[in-house]
Structure formats: structure tokens, C-alpha cells
């Protein structure tokens, strides 16, 4: 028996739900990240459209794409934002100033400033940065969807 005041609704687990807070527009920041070798833009569009359907169609929700400014999935995520006329928040890694720690530092900043992650790893190639992003997103209790 559901004793909460919120009614149970059927929910597609591939769709992220949002709530309206006292009639105020909510900004929903979603990181789109993945392998630098990821190049399947059609698949990305189909998956992101399905996952973000409720938010993209809700006039009270402003979706913002968070990008790590890398090649591959990150760049395609920015292209997705452009296609949907969404704002992009860019977090470039400071490779010159931070060296090898630049990627993890950037990933932590993104995880601290987002609500969700849609990750596109490619197995069979190096995915350390993507796996680090997934781990950090989970540590910060972001909604995480990993697309294989």
C-alpha cells in the first residue's frame, strides 16, 4: 500500500522525471559525456530524446546540457544542444595548469553542478575519463543512464 501523499504513476525507467517547485521553472542540468571515439550521433539523439522527453516537452523546465568540451560524445552532446536550442555550460579541462589531474577535476566540477548524466562509453577502447565521470555522478547522487 502506498502511504505517501504522492500518487504512484506508471514510469518508464528510461525517462527522467522532473518536478515543478511551487510553480517556478526548474533548470535541469544534464551532462552528456562519453568516449572521445564515440561518433553515433543518430543513436545519441534517439537515446537523449527518449530519456529527456518529459523535460524537453515541459514548459516549466529549462534543460541545460553540461559539456566537458572533449571530442566524441561531448562534442556530439553540444551538437544535440544546438539542435534543440538548449543552453550549453562548458567545463574545459585545464590540461596545461593541472596536467593529468585536469580530467578528474573537470569531472568533479561537472558532477557538482548537474542533475543527471547520460554516458556513452565505448568498450574495447580507453574509457577512463568516462568511467570516472560515471563514478563521480553516482557519488553525487545524480540520475545516471549509461548507454551501451
Ranges and model annotations:
Residues 12-24:
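Short, Lys/Arg-enriched N-terminal segments with co-localized hydrophobic residues
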Residues 24-27, 37-148:
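Acidic/glycine-enriched connector segments
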